[in-house]
A protein has these predicted regions:
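Auxiliary, metal-adjacent structural segments of Zn-dependent hydrolase domains
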Residues: 2-61, 70-71, 98
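Pan-zinc metallopeptidase signature
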Residues: 4-5, 134, 139-171
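Hydrophobic (often cysteine-bearing) scaffold residues that line and stabilize catalytic clefts
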Residues: 9, 13, 74-78, 82, ...
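Active-site-adjacent bridging/hinge elements
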Residues: 54-63, 112-124, 147
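Short pre-active-site segment immediately N-terminal to the catalytic Zn-binding motif
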Residues: 60-82, 131-134
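Post-HEXXH active-site segment of zinc metalloproteases
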Residues: 71-79, 91-125
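Active-site-flanking alpha-helical
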Residues: 86-94, 147
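Flexible glycine/proline-enriched surface loops and loop-helix/loop-strand junctions
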Residues: 124-132, 154
Length: 171
């Protein structure tokens, strides 16, 4: 198909991610490639972006067949990239090996649950992608926290001022 990350809304979203990382003083830039879905392989400092986001016709087809497109608009695309940048940042700096990271987020070696029961009233985790996803696993907790922290014009200091999750944002 000749698709690359230089097509669709992807280049603008990646440029924005670069700007957000630079504004926070982070020199790391995740490697990005097209794949069948969003993911950041464990131990790899990069982000897989769904191929259907590289062309508007494929995006429309995905919406028609699946009834949704994760990252299908620029706002959602940026939010998901921030989240996956957190996943990529972790292995780039070997964060999960640090004792203080484990004390704040938990052990990354804990197996992912087959399913999880979210606690909507919990204030121990940030809210970013929805469905209280940060509660599902320590690495998701970090990725969601990183995304909230990275978002430009975020009011997280006020939003989470009285929450135990603030400790994670200050990490």
């Amino acid at each position: 198909l000749g698709l690359t990350t230089a097509h669709g809304q992807i280049p603008a979203a990646l440029a924005r991610l670069d700007d957000e990382l630079a504004r926070r003083g982070i020199r790391f830039r995740p490697h990005c490639w097209l794949s069948e879905d969003w993911f950041s392989p464990d131990g790899v400092p990069g982000i897989a972006i769904p191929f259907y986001l590289a062309h508007p016709r494929l995006t429309r087809l995905e919406r028609r067949m699946m009834h949704e497109v994760e990252g299908g608009n620029l706002r959602c695309l940026r939010r998901t990239l921030r989240h996956d940048a957190g996943h990529a940042f972790d292995p780039a700096h070997r964060l999960r090996r640090r004792k203080n990271w484990r004390e704040v987020f938990g052990a990354a070696s804990v197996p992912y649950p087959v399913s999880y029961v979210p606690r909507p009233g919990s204030r121990r985790h940030v809210l970013h992608l929805g469905h209280w996803y940060a509660q599902s696993h320590p690495t998701e907790d970090f990725a969601e926290t990183f995304a909230v922290w990275l978002a430009p014009n975020s009011t997280w200091r006020n939003d989470y001022a009285d929450w135990p999750a603030l400790r994670k944002l200050l990490y």
